[in-house]
A protein has these predicted regions:
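A conserved beta-strand-loop-helix scaffold within acyl/acetyltransferase catalytic domains
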Residues: 2-57, 61-73, 121-231
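Acyl-donor binding region in acyl/amide transferases
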Residues: 71-139
Length: 231
C-alpha cells in the first residue's frame, strides 16, 4: 500500500518510520519541508509533491521525499531546495518490496524532462538500493562531505572541536551578549514577528513572506528546531 503526501496519515507514518531509522536527517522533517513549500509558493514556482510512504502490513517500511519543481515545460525532481531522499527500514524491507519501491519512484522520474536530484547519505559506507539502480542506468554521482555537530555532547567537548578563529568570537559573545533560548515550550509568534520586523528594518527589504516566518515558527513548535537570540 502507498500513502501519498496529500494523505492525512502521511505525517503519522512518516514519524513512525523516522523512529526506526538509525540516523534521520532532520533537515527533511515535515516542518522543514512545509517551510520549503511555502518558499516555493512565494517564488511563484510550479511544483507537485511526489513524496510517498510504502506500507507493509499497515506499517511504514520505506519513504520517498521528492517534489517536481521548476517551470512549465521543464520540471526537476528534488525536495524543493534539497535533493530528494529515501528512508528505509532495512530490517523489514525485502528484495521484492525494493523492486516495487523503485518502480514507483521511476514513474515520477520518467514523467519529467529535467533532472532527478537525489542524496544518498552512505552512513555505513554502502550505497542505497536506489543509488545502485540509478548508477546502473547511467546516473552521475558527485561526492560531497558534510559535518554534523552532535549537540548532545558536553559543552567542553563541543568547544574543544571549534577552530581557533571562531573561539574568540564565541568568547566575545559570552561576555557581551545575553543569549535567550526558545523552543517548543516558550516560542511565540510575537517574538518571531519582532525579529521579522527587525530583519526588514536592518536589511531594507522583506526577504521572506510572513507565511514563511510562520512556517519557521511551526518548526520550533514541532520540536524540529530551536531559536537562540542574543542582545
Amino acid at each position: 500500500m502507498i500513502v501519498k503526501f496529500s494523505n492525512k496519515l502521511f505525517e503519522y507514518y512518516f514519524q513512525e518510520l523516522a523512529k526506526k531509522i538509525d540516523w534521520f536527517p532532520s533537515i527533511y522533517s515535515i516542518g522543514i519541508i512545509n517551510l520549503f513549500e511555502q518558499r516555493a509558493i512565494d517564488n511563484n514556482k510550479v511544483f507537485e509533491n511526489c513524496s510517498f510512504i510504502f506500507l507493509h502490513d499497515e506499517k511504514p517500511i520505506a519513504c520517498f521525499i521528492g517534489v517536481k519543481v521548476g517551470q512549465k515545460g521543464k520540471m526537476n525532481i528534488r525536495a524543493y531546495e534539497l535533493p530528494s531522499i529515501i528512508l528505509i527500514d532495512e530490517m523489514n524491507f525485502s528484495k521484492n518490496q525494493s523492486k516495487l519501491f523503485i518502480l514507483e519512484i521511476e514513474k515520477y522520474i520518467n514523467d519529467i524532462a529535467g533532472i532527478f536530484y537525489y542524496r544518498d547519505t552512505m552512513l555505513d559506507g554502502s550505497l542505497s538500493i536506489l543509488s545502485k539502480h540509478l548508477l546502473s542506468k547511467g546516473a552521475t554521482a558527485i561526492p560531497k562531505f558534510s559535518i554534523f555537530i552532535d549537540l548532545l555532547e558536553s559543552e567542553k567537548k563541543l568547544k574543544s572541536n571549534i577552530r581557533k578563529s571562531y573561539k574568540s568570537l564565541i568568547n566575545w559573545g559570552e561576555k557581551e551578549l545575553k543569549p535567550s533560548i526558545y523552543d517548543a515550550s516558550n516560542i511565540t509568534w510575537e517574538l518571531i514577528n519582532d525579529f521579522r520586523l527587525l530583519h526588514i528594518k536592518e536589511s531594507g527589504t522583506e526577504t521572506m513572506s510572513e507565511l514563511s516566518w510562520k512556517k519557521r515558527l511551526d518548526t520550533v513548535k514541532r520540536g524540529e528546531a530551536f531559536l537562540i537570540v542574543g542582545h
